[in-house]
Every structure is written in structure tokens, then in C-alpha cells.
């Protein structure tokens, strides 16, 4: 797997687990809310979750997302692009 494919996989899984979180919780986390919680611009989260994105993310931000969504960090590396 190359860098672009890895970035796509991570982005796909961030979106998947954010939407899954929203189905299970009353307090929804939108892209805007997630970006606010991370302290990044919303365009970064939108680009990350985009189906054709190759936007990367820092390991620190990925760690923060895993804590916010209550998902083990290794889950973001599972699956196919």
C-alpha cells in the first residue's frame, strides 16, 4: 500500500466511524464539530473524508479522533481502499 492509498483508507475509516458514532449517540459529531474539537480548519476534515482524497493527517490528530469517537486507533488502518 502506498502513501496515497493509506491516506484514502484512513479518511474512509474516519468517515465510517464518525457516522457510526452518530447513529449510536444523541450528540452528533459533524465535520464542523470534529474540526472544532481538533482545532483544525473544517476543510481538512472534509478533504480527509472525501472519497477521492489523498489528504494526510498527523498521527496526533488521528489519535485525537480515536479518543473523540471512542475507536481504537488501529481500526483506522483496517479494510481496503
Q: What is each of the regions a protein language model found here?
A:
Residues 1-27:
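A short, Lys/Arg-rich alpha-helix, primarily the initiator
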Residues 52-64:
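Short, basic-rich loop-to-helix N-cap that marks the start of a DNA-contacting helix
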Residues 31, 42, 59-62, 73:
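Helix-turn-helix DNA-binding elements, focusing on the entry/boundary residues of the two helices
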Residues 12, 28-29, 57-60:
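Residue-level signal for the short linker/turn that defines the boundary of a DNA-recognition helix
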Residues 18, 35, 66:
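The alpha-helix within a helix-turn-helix
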Residues 57, 70-81:
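Short C-terminal boundary/hinge segments that cap the last helix of small helical domains
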Residues 25-48:
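Short alpha-helical DNA-recognition segment
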Amino acid at each position: 500500500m502506498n502513501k496515497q492509498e493509506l491516506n484514502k483508507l484512513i479518511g474512509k475509516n474516519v468517515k465510517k466511524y464518525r457516522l457510526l458514532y452518530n447513529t449510536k449517540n444523541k450528540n452528533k459529531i459533524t465535520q464542523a464539530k470534529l474540526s472544532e474539537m481538533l482545532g483544525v480548519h473544517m476543510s481538512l476534515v472534509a478533504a480527509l473524508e472525501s472519497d477521492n482524497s489523498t489528504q494526510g493527517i498527523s498521527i496526533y490528530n488521528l489519535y485525537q479522533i480515536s479518543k473523540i469517537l471512542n475507536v481504537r486507533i488501529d481500526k483506522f488502518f483496517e479494510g481496503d481502499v
